Amino acid sequence: MVLLVVDTQKGIVDERLYAFEKFVSNIRKLIRTAREQGIEVVYVQHDDGPGTGFSIGDDEFEIYSGFAPLLTEKRFVKTVCSAFKKESGLLEYLTEKGEKDVMVCGIMTDFCINATVEAGFEHGLHMIVPAYANSTQDNEYMTGEQSYHYYNEFLWPNRYADCVPMDKALGLLKK
């Protein structure tokens, strides 16, 4: 198993996210537990391209300090919603390692997390989504809360991922 931390970058990790404090706390617990158990933590960062303010070299592109990777932890960069798009190299990396179980956390629920969960499933990976370890902001169609519940409680379970309570997620990391 690997813990995949998606798009937790300075420019978008803030109070605009649904259930912000719980989200931050849960991701910190997941990262800490994975490291304690010797489970690899892998980071993915979204790059909107040069001149956007959200690209390699920009401060907003960097990982939020509360989730900062260790120097030894892998980072992948993507330019589309799915972390598994060929250009990122993530799928090839996991395939070479023989990893099939991916616990995913991060942002945005309705964009990059959804695309990553569905693409991972389509590539034959067992996707695990811990409760309140993904979040998003309000948009013109749904609040962040509505988006969170739609994906975590309706769309992903029994289709694309095992959506599990935090205590179960932590237990899976401890096996």
Give residue ranges: language-model regions.
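N-terminal nucleotide-binding beta1-loop-alpha1 segment
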Residues: L4-D7
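Phosphate-coordination/substrate-recognition cap region in phosphate-metabolizing enzymes
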Residues: G51
